[in-house]
Each structure stands twice: as C-alpha cells, then as structure tokens.
C-alpha cells in the first residue's frame, strides 16, 4: 500500500471510531488531505531549471549563413517541465537575452564596410513547448537522456538600428540601398514576434534531484525586420536567431518514508 492510500485509510479508520461531534473535524481533515494530495501529485516529477548561453543573430547584417558569431550575446533562461508520459513532456520556457548585427565586422564582400549598418535589440521570449525524450526516460534518474523539442511563443524586441555610418557617396542617393532605407524607415520595426523554437538537447542526471542539461534551439520568426533592415539589405531572406545553452535542472518529488501508521488489510 502506498503512502497516500495508507494515510487516507488511517483517516477513514479514525472517522469510523470517533464520536459524532468529532466526525466533522475528521471530514475536514480528509478534505484537506485530498486537496494537498492532489497538489502534491501535480508537482510530482515536475522539474525546474536555469541555463545560460549564447544568442546568435542570423540575418542581413552577416554574410555567414550560420549567423553572426562575431556579435554573439549572452542570455539566461528559466523553465519548468512536467512529464506527460515516458516520452513526452510539456515545458514552459522564458528567456532574457539580446541580439546584435554589425556590417563593419566583416570585410567581405567589400560593400559591407561601406554600408556599415548596425542594430542591437534586447530580447525577452516566452514559449510553450513539447519535449520528446528519445529514450523514453522521463521518470528515470540515470543515463544520458537526449531529447528534441518544438513549440510556439512570442519574442519581444526593441530594435535600435543605425545607418549613420553609411558611405552615401559610395552608393549614391539613387541606389537600391538608399531607396530601400526610405522604405524601411516608413515600415518601422516590430515589438512582438511570433516565434517557433525547434531544438535538440540532452540531460545527464547527477542525482535523484539534479541534472545537467545542454541544448541548442533555432527560432523561426517569420519577419525580415528583426534587425530593422529589409529592402535596404536582402528582402528575399527572413531573419532568425538561435542559441546554445548549458544549465542545471531540479526535479521535485517526495521520497517514500515510513509513516508510523499501520496498514489496513
């Protein structure tokens, strides 16, 4: 007989043995026990975590198709995860970071040093995710546990763009860059973006309660104005960003202990 059913049996036996005036008190105790048991069951196997890592902007202000590793920024994430079954878990994720892109950091192609676009934005994101434990070990506390995940969320940004360093003589006022800037300024910059995170990671249990985790996540954000530039740069390609982080996870749960109440046959 498990801990919950044993305690409940004790309370029921007490209810049957006490006098009528005291039965109301026992009923209240039973109801409180059921409520606390429901809450404990909800938190059972739930885990929370914190990790830190790097955020990489991928867009018009870098020639590298993998993103601007010359302007990486730090970030911090908090999350809570609850297993649904052995393979699947639901996760709430919140991150605080920043993104940056800078043409001047690249000497090739030559025009980047002349265009000299720059942007910076703080970033705050919230997402709900589904996490697939590849080995089906959501309830285990041993062995490496690789996983993949995806979900949907919102990324809040505040774009600060700068084109004051541009060599206008190099491009000319009739160039596509100059006319594109006029259009981009008229368009403005977004403050909130729909994001779809897709990533992979792994957990390594250190004990019954603690685990290390490392993961990388790519965000699809469906806009070309993450950096504030589109028609003045490359409007055919959307902007994105990705992150890689390492952190620590704490798993809730109550160890089974003796209760001092005899079991009921």
PLM segments and residue spans:
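Outer-membrane beta-barrel proteins
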Residues: 57-63, 100-105, 157-162, 223-227, ...
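N-terminal signal peptide c-region/cleavage motif recognized by signal peptidases
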Residues: 35-37
């Amino acid at each position: 007989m498990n801990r919950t059913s044993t305690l409940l049996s004790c309370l029921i036996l007490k209810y049957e043995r006490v006098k009528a005036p005291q039965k109301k008190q026992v009923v209240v105790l039973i109801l409180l026990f059921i409520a606390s048991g429901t809450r404990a069951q909800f938190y059972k196997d739930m885990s929370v975590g914190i990790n830190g890592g790097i955020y990489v902007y991928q867009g018009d202000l870098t020639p590298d198709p993998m993103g601007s590793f010359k302007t990486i920024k730090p970030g911090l994430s908090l999350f809570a995860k609850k297993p649904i079954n052995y393979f699947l878990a639901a996760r709430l994720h919140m991150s605080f970071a920043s993104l940056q892109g800078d043409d001047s950091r690249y000497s090739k192609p030559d025009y980047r040093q002349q265009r000299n676009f720059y942007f910076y934005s703080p970033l705050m994101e919230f997402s709900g995710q589904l996490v697939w434990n590849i080995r089906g070990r959501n309830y285990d506390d041993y062995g490496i546990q690789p996983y993949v995940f995806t979900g949907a969320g919102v990324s809040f940004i505040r774009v600060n763009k700068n084109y004051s360093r541009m060599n206008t003589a190099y491009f000319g006022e009739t160039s596509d860059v100059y006319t594109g800037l006029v259009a981009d300024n008229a368009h403005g910059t977004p403050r909130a973006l729909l994001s779809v995170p897709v990533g992979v990671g792994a957990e390594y249990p250190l004990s019954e309660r603690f685990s290390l985790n490392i993961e990388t996540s790519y965000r699809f954000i469906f806009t070309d104005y993450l950096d504030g530039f589109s028609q003045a740069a490359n409007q055919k390609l959307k902007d994105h960003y990705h992150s890689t982080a390492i952190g620590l996870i704490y798993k809730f749960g109550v160890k089974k202990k003796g209760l001092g109440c005899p079991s009921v046959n």
